[in-house]
Each structure stands twice: as structure tokens, then as C-alpha cells.
């Protein structure tokens, strides 16, 4: 076992604080509308330029192991804020740094660290309640666009495209961000339910221009098994032919004689038909077939529940206004399912999302909700160079998370104003003893730090602005982008309540642990073993 280096008390805390400050100083320059860029060196390729706090934090690893422990703990604050709300990482880092610096000064002055921590916790719990009271719902497209704009470092084009995407696919729709091919941002919206399975035979294609299968007002047959025998399909095919409507077959697979017969019938024009494989695998496939059944008002023909394909009738088939199938994807538009049944299914999947433990499962379940509830939007980020593209994609993803958080818990005045208003309401808060009161004051003073940093990054005088904002009321604050005082919500400077709340809670949690640290242990570097002595081959010259 390797030897350890152990440090105690003030000696340990000083080193830890140095690490905290190195990481926080690198991250906090990105805060606000006039936040600066940070350039990250990469082991290969061009350096990355970013204004995303968590991206900067993730890159930092310090040589001194005691300093590094402090830096890693603040990195944890940024990561937790990012996981919970998807944004607010820089605010969380700035708050953590302020609480740790003020808290450790009090510890050095002889205060009891445990009482300090209790005071900080008490102040944060009260501040969170005040933030909830200050929160206003974020319902309209304009407010959503404003939140997105602020989170994307005051880039209004990003805010507008996110608001447009949310308007088109609804609050539950899936919005993904991809790298585009053009210079401008683009928005692609897929309406209806799309799944990643294409036609089983190119002979089903009826739109030669686009190379796709287009079926208008089709019946949809859903089967939870492989179909290889055409006899099983005959009753359904005859019924569909009499109705003179097209048929889409979604099954585990259609092969051999069955596929060949369908192709021949389609080419001769006897019955317009197309077949695709069911999406997903295993239990997920069964669940997605059931989703399609509910969306289209059909039934999944499955032997598990006693239904046989030979006995299927037109009543068992789903229906839709249109189906479009390409080589890779199938899209069902305007299914004929009962709206109450669809809403019930969505509620059921939401419950599964609440109970899911893995991120992968949650993501897949969220996709299913979106496909049932509205659709999928893809924001394609455009830029002139790859470096700019990566930087912008980071900002768009941040803005997307921020708008989702805003819709969930509402918004408060941005620019650090909400924290100052919450702190001013708690001026009469007292703890159980004087040391807890110091802890409360540490937390309340730290809540000014985000505003001060935003002003500093904009090149203005932080103390003057902080005093002016503190003297104001309600949403009165400072717009660092224009240098104007006014109502922050009217100026469109909004922060999601969830982002501000999460930043404060996680910052206080980790800062409290650091203030109460009394010893730090790290591994000593291993000393290299001495080299083998030179054996020397002297006196052996003359050997042939």
C-alpha cells in the first residue's frame, strides 16, 4: 500500500481553498451577457472555445493533490447543477466560492464550523422558499424565447428557435440539438409518430421522386411475431381489398412467401400495401407496438393475449390520415386513436419515467411520450467553422435545458437580482446562537456574488451597482448588456427558478462540507526504484 500525505486543520483548508479559487476563477469569467471566452487545449485537433461553465470546470485537473481535492469538490457543484437543471453551473460555482471563502475566514477566526454550517443551511432553506414566492409562471412563447436568449449568452436567435420548436412540438415534445451543414440555424419538425424502421422491400415504393412509400388513409395491421406464411394474412388482405384502402403491416418481420406475395399484389395494383419491421427489441418492442395501437385505434395481434392473425378483422386494424415510409424511417401522421386513451398512455409512461433509475431508460421513455403527445423537433446548429459550431452547440443545449426548467417551475428576475431580493427578505433571520448567525450572514453575503461577477465581467463597478440594486425593490436590477437599470422581467432578463434554486442548494451543500473539513489525506508519489548498476564488460576486448 502506498504511503499517504496527511494534513490537518488550517494547513489543509488553505490548500483546499487555493484549489477552489483556481477552478472558480477560471469558470466565473464566463458569467453574464459580457462573459469572456475560455480556450481549452485538446490533445488533438483545434482548441475548443467555450462560455459554458461546466465545460471549463471539467477540463481542470491540478498538479498539487490537496489543491486538486478542493477543485474537484467545486467541479461536483457545477456537475450537480448541470444534472438537475441543465444550466446555472457558473452561478453555482460563484456561490460555492463565495460561501467557502467567507466561511473559512470565520473558521480561521475561531468559530465552530458545525454551527456555521447549520446557519448556512438555515439561510438557504429560507432563501429557497423566498425564491419560490418570487417565481412567476413561464407560459407564453415570448417568455420562453427570453429565457433561451439569456441562457445562450444573449443570443436572441437561439432563444427564438427554441421557442419556435417548443411551440410546434409542445412542452412534452422531444427537442434534440445536432450539428448542421449550413451557416444559419435550422429547425426540422417531424409531426406524428416516427420510428427508425424503413420499408422491407424497395418494390413497395410508390413515390419515385422521393424514393418513399406514401399511403393515404391506410389501415394499419400490428403483429407481435414474424409473418412468413401468406395464408395467415389472407383474411385481412381480402377485407382491405374490398374496402379499397391501402394497408401498412408492422410486424417483428415479414419474410419469404408472405413478403413475395405482398410485393406481387402491390405491383399488380390488387391491394396497395407496405410492410415494415416493428421498432425496438424485446419488451421495448412490445411497448412501442402498443403505443402505435393506441395512437391509431388498433389492436396488437399477439398470441400472448389469445389473438390469432388468421382471425383478425378490419375492426382490429388501426387507422391514420397518412403514412410515409423511407429507407430508414416510418412516420404515422394523425392516428385515429381515442384522445382519452392516448392521454392515459402518456400518463402511464410519465409514471414509468418517475420510477426509472437509468438515464438511458428515462431518455427512451421520454421519446415515447413525445411521439404520442406531439412530435420531434431537431435544431441544426449552423456556424462558419467547426470551433464556432461546438461553442454554439454547447450554448444551444444550455438554453434548451434552461427553457425546460422555466416551463417546469417558472421564472424569476435574472442578473442575480432574485438572489439579492431573497437575501434582503431574510435580514431578520436568526439562528440558535451567535455562530449560526455568522453562518446566516455568510450565506446572505454570498448571494450577492453572482450579480457582482456579472457586473465585473461587463467592466463596471460592482459595489456601486450592488448598492443601487439593493436599494431598489421588486424586479429592479441592472442590465449588464446595455448598462441600464430597470425592471428585469420587462427587459426580458429572466432566470428559471429551478436553475437559481438548484445553484444555491448545491453550492451551499458542498461549501458546507468543505468548511467542516478538518483533515485531508492524499497518496504520496511513488519514488522510482534505483536503476540497476552498470555491469561493465571491461577487459573483454579482443573477443572474436
Curated annotation (Swiss-Prot):
Keywords of this entry: ATP-binding, Chaperone, Cytoplasm, Isomerase, Nucleotide-binding
Record carries keyword DNA damage: no
GO cellular component, one term: GroEL-GroES complex
EC primary class: isomerase
Binding residues annotated for ATP, in chain numbering: 30-33, 51, 87-91, 415, 479-481, 495
EC code: 5.6.1.7
Keyword Transmembrane: no
UniProt-listed InterPro entries: Chaperonin_Cpn60_CS, Cpn60/GroEL, Cpn60/GroEL/TCP-1, GroEL-like_apical_dom_sf, GROEL-like_equatorial_sf, TCP-1-like_intermed_sf
Record's catalysed reaction(s): ATP + H2O + a folded polypeptide = ADP + phosphate + an unfolded polypeptide
Compartments (UniProt record): Cytoplasm
Domain of life: Bacteria
MF terms in GO: ATP binding; ATP-dependent protein folding chaperone; isomerase activity; unfolded protein binding
GO biological processes: chaperone cofactor-dependent protein refolding; protein refolding; response to heat
Stated role: Together with its co-chaperonin GroES, plays an essential role in assisting protein folding. The GroEL-GroES system forms a nano-cage that allows encapsulation of the non-native substrate proteins and provides a physical environment optimized to promote and accelerate protein folding.
Assembly: Forms a cylinder of 14 subunits composed of two heptameric rings stacked back-to-back. Interacts with the co-chaperonin GroES.
Family listed: Belongs to the chaperonin (HSP60) family.
HAMAP family: CH60
Name assigned to this protein: Chaperonin GroEL 1
Organism (species): Vibrio cholerae serotype O1 (strain ATCC 39315 / El Tor Inaba N16961)
